[in-house]
């Protein structure tokens, strides 16, 4: 199944790691890049098994929008399976928040 990641999700991930690198000098760019690649890869893998995850519980707005939620690399990912005009289903990822920023 095709996966579409909202631009704000990319921004949230990049901003989190940019700030993390400034706050933690021991966190190097190579490590961050590897984490981002694993995170993005896992989001695209949602297209293989989008229905196995539970309904979102982290944010009220996610619950109201009936998103599903998964956690990858300490990021909570909010997504929903949508249907396009041709009747094809796809995964739309709408939001992401790191556990350290939410709790």
Q: Which residues make up each language-model segment?
A:
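Basic, Lys/Arg-enriched alpha-helical interface segments
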Residues: 1-67
